[in-house]
Design a protein with these regions (language model features):
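PLP-dependent enzyme catalytic core of the Aspartate aminotransferase-like
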Residues: 2, 124, 133-134, 151, ...
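N-terminal glycine-rich, Lys/His-bearing helix-loop that initiates the first secondary-structure elements
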Residues: 1-56
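Short hydrophobic/aromatic beta-strand micro-patches
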Residues: 227, 349-351, 411-413
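Conserved N-terminal alpha-helix of the aminotransferase class I/II PLP-enzyme fold
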Residues: 44-93, 118-125
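Glycine-centered tight turns that cap/initiate beta-strands
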Residues: 81, 152, 318-321, 368, ...
């Protein structure tokens, strides 16, 4: 009989077992233990020295590794089809670490301008202070990515489903463009989850998630994760000496040699996480493992409910427009069919007939929906992006991202669909008062 780890397991089985195929070797506990420890005992002085020199893989200090986090990292890497993963303290930390690892002062990133407002703001206003500029392009414009890349571009960055309008970019096409310039495609796939989309299958090289969202699923823990495909040849590219040449802080260790197929993830852990410490809590790692165990079940219900809400809104006379790629008249419908046969998540926007005050009045009359800044919770959520999540953007930037004063973002939960639609209808009816 083959070992469980050697079998070609299906997604629903992997989300329960990978990383801990047998009971805990010390206690025989079936659940993954929470290892609440800051540090680890070395066998002897040589063992300690080898660990610090990256000659022997294993735990050194809690800022870098933790056994609970290790199970979570292995499981999410397996679900994405990657070679390695690194869990960190938030989705924002995952994005910033991945791009900081790739680009240095004088370099640039090419990014879709339809990304999450917080990421846009970090790239435009914060990362630029460190000498890394970002060229934001319209992903719907022909040759936009190709035309923006130059000799100093170190990555292309997109989202699998744009936040908040759920726009879709042709991942395969953009990956080919990036690879023709010997640079990686980095994709934030938070809204899709590995259950709906595995970007590595279409040529992406680095996948990022805010684990706070669907992975955790219950709005109870903050975290992020970086997953590496293992397919991008950092050495052959010639553009990433930080991975392929000796590192002075590790006495000449070369990450592409020390960690084949996981050079970027290892670099982020050994350098950036070591030095800046956005470490994931072991307790949050445990909660994310709990979330992963029901990921496919929850996402199926999220998608089912979302499609029914989209249908309801698209027929409502008080709705100006619904932004969801499943709609036949959506310009993203062909890409939706290509990349999302199981559905495109449950986060999308619509424009209500009226102005910003109309949108806010509608939101303020919702009761099943919660007004808060998170998404991808089992509870349904609503927010007015222009005055909250994307409020740091200028009017011009909001317009470029397709966010209008009357735009409302919904995150459809797993409640009974009748209760969700009733709540929305009650809010629409309140506009007549």
């Amino acid at each position: 009989m083959s070992k469980l780890s050697e079998r070609n397991l299906k997604f629903e089985t992997k989300q329960l077992h990978i990383g801990q195929e047998t009971a805990d070797p010390v206690t025989d506990a079936r659940a993954v233990p929470i290892y609440a420890t800051t540090s680890y005992v070395f066998h002897n002085s040589q063992h300690a020295a080898d660990r610090f020199a990256l000659k022997d893989a294993g735990n050194i200090y809690g800022r870098l590794t933790n056994p609970t986090e290790d199970v979570f990292e292995k499981r999410i890497a397996a679900l994405e089809g990657g070679t390695a993963a690194l869990a960190v303290a938030s989705g924002a930390a995952a994005v910033s670490y991945a791009l900081q690892a790739l680009a240095k002062a004088g370099d640039n990133i090419v990014a879709a301008k339809t990304i999450y407002g917080g990421t846009y703001n970090w790239l435009e206003h914060t990362f630029s202070e460190y000498g890394v500029t970002t060229k934001f392009v319209d992903p719907d414009e022909e040759n936009a990515f190709e035309n923006a890349i130059d000799e100093n571009t170190k990555a292309v960055f997109i989202e699998s489903l744009g936040n908040p309008n759920s726009n879709i970019i042709d991942i395969e096409e953009v990956a080919n463009i990036a690879h023709s310039h010997k640079i990686p495609l980095v994709i934030d796939s938070t809204f899709a989850t590995p259950y709906l989309l595995r970007p590595f299958e279409y040529g992406a090289d680095i996948v990022i998630h805010s684990a706070t969202k669907f992975i955790g699923g219950h709005g109870t823990a903050l975290g992020g994760v970086i997953v590496e495909s293992g397919k991008f040849d950092w050495a052959a590219s010639g553009k990433f000496p930080q991975f392929s040449e000796p590192n002075a802080s590790y006495h000449g260790a070369v990450f592409t040699e020390a960690a084949p197929g996981a050079a970027l993830v290892t670099y982020v852990r050994a350098i950036l996480l070591r030095d800046t410490g956005a470490t994931l809590s072991p307790f949050h790692a445990f909660m994310f493992l709990q979330g992963l165990e029901t990921l496919s079940l929850r996402v199926e219900r999220h998608v089912e409910n979302a499609l029914k809400v989209v249908d309801f809104l698209s027929k409502n006379p008080k709705v100006e427009n619904v932004n969801h790629p499943s709609l036949p008249d959506s310009k993203y419908n062909a890409l939706y069919k290509k990349y999302f046969p199981k559905g495109a998540g449950s986060i999308f926007t619509f424009e209500i007939k009226g102005d910003a005050e109309t949108a806010k009045k509608f939101i303020d009359h919702l009761e099943v929906f919660s007004l808060l800044a998170n998404v991808a919770d089992v509870k349904s959520l609503a927010i007015h992006p222009a005055s909250t999540t994307h409020s740091q953007l200028s009017e011009a930037e909001l317009a470029e991202q397709g966010i209008k004063p009357n735009t409302i973002r919904l995150s459809i939960g797993t409640e009974n669909i009748d209760d969700i639609i009733y709540d929305l209808q009650e809010a629409f009816d309140s506009l007549d008062d």
